[in-house]
Amino acid sequence: MDARAIPFDTRRDCEAQFLAVVAAAQHSLRLFDPDGAVFALGTIQVNAALRAFLQRGGTLRLALHEPGHIERHCPRFLRLLRDYGHACECRQSPKNLRQLSDSFSIADEQHVVRRFHSDHMRGEASFDDPRAVEVPHHRFEAIWEASRPTLHPTTTGL
């Protein structure tokens, strides 16, 4: 673990670090999780933080294996996608990548929160540390390129 890394092992600490990464983001947010549940995208607090980020001109990319959790439990996030469709994109990974079981969020290629396995809350956050972001960033780009668009918010879809 990097000396600047902040370890966590509870949902509360993970969510706090995720919100800190969103708050630190100026230009880009890149999120990967098997179902998006760890990011608490349906909560008022996360919705407000993401809206503030997008209002500042940021862009959001979310990659996941299955969109069902977000479709069923995150109407605020679906409204955010509708309201900021020009700045947000979500993609679903292909079946050959479904074994990937970690989770991470990256802001501006400077800040990262990552869980080592999606079944556990254990992970770490690093801020103002481009070296800590290198591997997750390359992994995200590879996942993104292999994935297809999902979560298309439409008037009939909401």
Per-segment meaning from a language model:
Residues 1-30, 34-158:
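PLD/PLD-like phosphodiesterase catalytic module centered on the HKD motif
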